A protein has these predicted regions:
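Local beta-strand N-terminus motif with an aromatic residue
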Residues: 34, 99-100
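A short SAM/SAH-binding and catalytic strip from SAM-dependent methyltransferases
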Residues: 100-116
Length: 217
């Protein structure tokens, strides 16, 4: 099931967006080791500027442009799970020995139905270890619109939003319960409701007792 998409231009657009959870991404950083960050969207200047302060390998892979997200596939197009995993793996095109510390998923999960999301998570698995954490954005329910934005991270508690430059792809709702089931090895350890109905998620492997899986709404 899809839900209503937001208009491409918003009368109340505000570029800066406060985050209560983005700072958690940096709590496990070890200053003597290189940080590997995967950003699923296009390279945004705020993200580049922030991570320039770290010993960091910053990888931008804009998966929003994948044909799989267009919703225009033929009705008889039914790839297997493994074929979808292989397509995502090819799109990621990561070196075999890559281990990611931080995944910036932004609102990418909202553009994948359950089948695609499972395949994407499986394709990412070889590059994940016990310390990997992630950040994502969603909507609380189908009555909330998902704005057509792109994102960067400006500082530890502030994101920067950019108006989307292309027509918004089809959007699919995922409740927090469904999302937890679809994310496999990732757990939603913390979630916060934003004033406009969006939700931010902090994801981890669930191996660290200091992160408690307790939604606040």
């Amino acid at each position: 099931m899809r839900f209503k998409r937001a208009e491409s231009r918003s009368q109340s657009f505000n570029a800066d967006l406060h985050s209560n959870l983005a700072s958690l991404l940096f709590e496990r950083i070890q200053v003597d080791q290189q940080l590997v960050v995967l950003d699923i969207g296009p390279a945004m200047p705020t993200t580049v500027d922030l991570f320039a302060n770290f010993k960091c390998k910053l990888i931008f892979i804009d998966l929003y442009s994948l044909d799989l997200l267009s919703g225009n596939c033929p009705d008889d197009y039914e790839p297997t799970h493994q074929q979808l995993v292989e397509q995502f793996t090819a799109a990621l095109n990561l070196e075999a020995n890559t281990k990611i510390n931080i995944c910036l998923f932004w609102d990418f999960f909202n553009y994948l139905d359950g089948t695609l999301l499972k395949a994407f998570i499986d394709s990412l698995h070889p590059y994940i270890d016990d310390s990997t954490c992630g950040y994502g954005l969603g909507v609380l329910n189908a009555r909330s619109q998902l704005p057509n934005y792109q994102y960067g991270i400006k500082n530890l508690d502030k994101l920067h939003q950019y108006l989307g430059t292309e027509e918004q792809k089809p959007v699919y709702p995922h409740s927090q319960r469904d999302l937890n089931n679809l994310l496999g090895y990732f757990d939603i350890d913390k979630s916060r409701l934003m004033p406009d109905g969006r939700v931010e998620y902090f994801l981890s492997q669930g191996s660290d007792d200091k992160f408690v899986k307790k939604p606040v709404f």
